[in-house]
Amino acid sequence: MKKTGYFLLAVIVIVAAAGVGYWKFSGNPDALREIVLEQCLPDQLQHQNPAPCAEVKPRAGYVVFKDRHGPLQYLLMPTYRINGTESPLLLEPATPNFFWLAWQARGYMSKKYGHDIPDSAVSLAINSRLGRSQDHLHIHISCIRPDVREQLDNDLTRISTRWLPLPGGLMGHEYLARRVTESELAQRSPFMMLAEEVPEARDHMGRYALAVVRQSDDSFVLLATERNLLTLNRASAEEIQDHSCAILSSR
C-alpha cells in the first residue's frame, strides 16, 4: 500500500505541475520574438532607432529590452531564433556569450534608476523550458532578492570552482553552484560550462535554469537548478530575483 500511495502522490504532483505549466504557457509564447524580429531589429536597420528596445546590436547579435515587470528589469535577447536553454546553438563556439553581454548591459538599470546600482544588487537569470513563459531566449537582468544575497554572502568561502550542491539550496530548491573569475565569465559561456562539466547536462539542457551573481570578492557565482516535478521545481532561476528591487531601499 505504501508504494501505491507514493505512486499516486507522484502522479498528483506531476499533474499539478503540468497544470501550472499549461496556465503559464496559455498566452502568446512568441510575443518577445515578435517584438525583437518584427519591431526592434527592423527599426534599427531601417531608421537607426532601436525602439521599442533600449538597444539593438545587429552585428553582435543581441538586443536589450525593458521588461514591463518591475521598474528596473531588462531582458537581453538574441536577434535571431533561439528558443531557450535547450537550443544546441548555445553550445556552439560561434554563438555570442549572452550571459557576459547581459552583464555588460546592467548599466541600463542604473540609468533607469537615476543612481549607480552596486554590482552586488544585480543578478542575471534564465529559466528552463518548463519554467519560462516565452519561447525566445531571454536573460533577466534584475535585482537579487535580499535573502538570496545574504545567503550567497554567507556561503562565499564554501563555493568551489567546481559545480557542487549549494548548501541548503535556494528558495526551497536544489541548486548547483560554481565560482568563476570575471575573465572566465567573459571568455566562456555558462551554458558551455554547465554542459561540459555537469554529468548528463549536455543531453538535457532544457531541464536547467541558470543564474549569475557577483560576489564581494569580485568573483561570480554560477547557479544552476534542474527541473524536478516531484519537488514542484520547474527550474525557474528567476525566483532568486526581486523585480521590485527592495535591496536598493535597504542600502
UniProtKB/Swiss-Prot annotation:
Catalytic activity: a CDP-1,2-diacyl-sn-glycerol + H2O = a 1,2-diacyl-sn-glycero-3-phosphate + CMP + 2 H(+)
Cellular component GO terms, alphabetical: plasma membrane
First-level EC class: hydrolase
Listed SUPFAM superfamilies: HIT-like (SSF54197)
Pathway note: Phospholipid metabolism; CDP-diacylglycerol degradation; phosphatidate from CDP-diacylglycerol: step 1/1
Family annotation (InterPro entries): CDP-diacylglyc_Pase, CDP-diacylglyc_Pase_proteobac, HIT-like_sf
Localization annotation: Cell inner membrane
Family: Belongs to the Cdh family.
Name by which UniProt lists this protein: CDP-diacylglycerol pyrophosphatase
Lineage: Bacteria, Pseudomonadati, Pseudomonadota, Gammaproteobacteria, Enterobacterales
Gene: cdh
